[in-house]
């Protein structure tokens, strides 16, 4: 069965989606988040909140995401944190990512929505495919699926023996998910994770072409494996000289940014934006801490080094997140503009037909 959109969806914070301008070629979410050609964009990682402790309040969260969309940020990324593990100190964005993505798909209308990342080996590929295709359809083609094996080993035993070695499980999970969200969705698939009979397909079928699957980190794989199987690579914050070597190797395997068939490279980290715009950089594990002027210079260095998107997490700021977002929007976003790729018309109702 295949679900087809029929009519524009209900409005979001900036109004409903408009007529589809996607056409053939890359998925519309990829074109907006990663325009390529040496141009980087700015993305945000949930939660959009400055806080101390393990779990955010999530007060005013939808309004803040809407404000980020209005300002022109390219994408908003959610994390997959099912359990609060003692000593880990991180409850993610509190809400289940798929439930939250459903809310965001209707509350927003342009910003790309992604996971960074779904811990694929802890979820069955059929369920991940169903959820991602649903969000993509509801949002008008704005879904990017970042995948990882996870960095929280304390969670793994809660999922039973089948999840005991997430890195070993990744290739089978990835292949099954790719089959379900790709082009040949009715040919059948045989996997240690399940048997999909010929003629059995996902519903809704991906409505805007093959869903992009992005790798976070390496997942216990080689960079060659990532380059072959993923549609893009999300990596943690690196010093510019290390990042440049990383992206150079990636480009040798996948092609230059913006060229036909090339694959994007994004870099994610915590950002503490000082009130003094000239405040010098200081060390911050997995991130950056400084004023906006050296930050702009640093991000331009990353852009020149081949980074297609810089993804920032604001949770460690002592200043309110609204204030930090406003400063980024005024002083950094003009240097990293998001292309005007309109989403497809969202479904107000669905027409279902047989294969």
Regions found by a protein language model. Give the residues of each.
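Flexible, glycine-rich active-site loops centered on histidine and acidic residues
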Residues: 39-56, 120-189, 237, 241
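Short, acidic/polar
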Residues: 55-68, 131, 215-225, 290-302
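An alpha-helical appendage that flanks or caps ligand/catalytic pockets
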Residues: 13-38, 164-207, 236-355
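N-terminal beta1-alpha1-beta2 module of alpha/beta enzyme domains
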Residues: 1-107, 211, 315-319, 327, ...
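Hydrophobic faces of well-ordered beta-strands that scaffold small-molecule active sites
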Residues: 42-46, 76-78, 113-115, 143-147, ...
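Conserved, mostly hydrophobic/aromatic
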Residues: 72, 80, 104, 135, ...
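Active-site mouth loops of central-metabolism enzymes
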Residues: 46-59, 118-126, 208-218, 280-293
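Acidic (Asp/Glu)-rich catalytic clusters
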Residues: 32-37, 69-70, 101-110, 132, ...
């Amino acid at each position: 069965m295949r679900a087809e959109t029929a009519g524009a969806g209900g409005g979001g914070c900036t109004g409903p989606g408009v007529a589809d301008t996607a056409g053939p070629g890359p998925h519309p979410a990829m074109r907006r988040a990663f325009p390529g050609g040496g141009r980087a964009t700015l993305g945000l990682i949930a939660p959009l909140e400055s806080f101390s402790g393990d779990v955010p309040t999530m007060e005013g969260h939808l309004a803040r995401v809407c404000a980020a969309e209005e300002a022109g940020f390219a994408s908003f990324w959610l994390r997959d944190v099912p359990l609060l593990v003692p000593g880990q100190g991180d409850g993610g964005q509190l809400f289940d990512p798929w439930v939250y993505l459903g809310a965001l798909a209707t509350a927003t209308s342009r910003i790309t929505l992604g996971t960074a990342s779904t811990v694929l080996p802890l979820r069955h590929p059929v369920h991940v495919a169903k959820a991602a295709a649903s969000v993509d359809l509801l949002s008008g083609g704005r879904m990017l699926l970042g995948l990882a094996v996870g960095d929280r080993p304390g969670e793994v035993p809660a999922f039973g023996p089948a999840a005991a070695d997430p890195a070993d499980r990744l290739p089978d999970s990835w292949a099954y998910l790719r089959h379900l969200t790709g082009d040949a969705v009715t040919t059948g698939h045989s996997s240690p994770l399940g048997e999909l009979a010929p003629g059995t397909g996902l519903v809704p079928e991906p409505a805007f072409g093959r869903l992009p699957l992005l790798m976070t980190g390496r997942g216990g794989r080689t960079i060659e494996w990532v380059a072959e199987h993923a549609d893009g690579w999300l990596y943690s914050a690196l010093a510019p000289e290390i990042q440049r070597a990383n992206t150079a190797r990636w480009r040798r395997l996948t092609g230059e940014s913006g060229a036909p068939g090339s694959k994007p490279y994004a870099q994610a980290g915590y950002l503490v934006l000082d009130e003094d715009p000239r405040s010098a950089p200081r060390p911050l594990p997995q991130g950056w801490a400084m004023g906006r002027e050296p930050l702009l210079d640093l991000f331009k260095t990353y852009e020149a080094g081949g980074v297609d998107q810089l993804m920032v997490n604001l949770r460690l700021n002592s200043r309110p997140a609204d204030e930090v977002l406003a400063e980024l929007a005024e002083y950094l976003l003009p240097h990293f503009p998001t292309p005007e790729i309109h989403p497809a018309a969202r479904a107000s109702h669905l027409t279902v037909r047989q294969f």
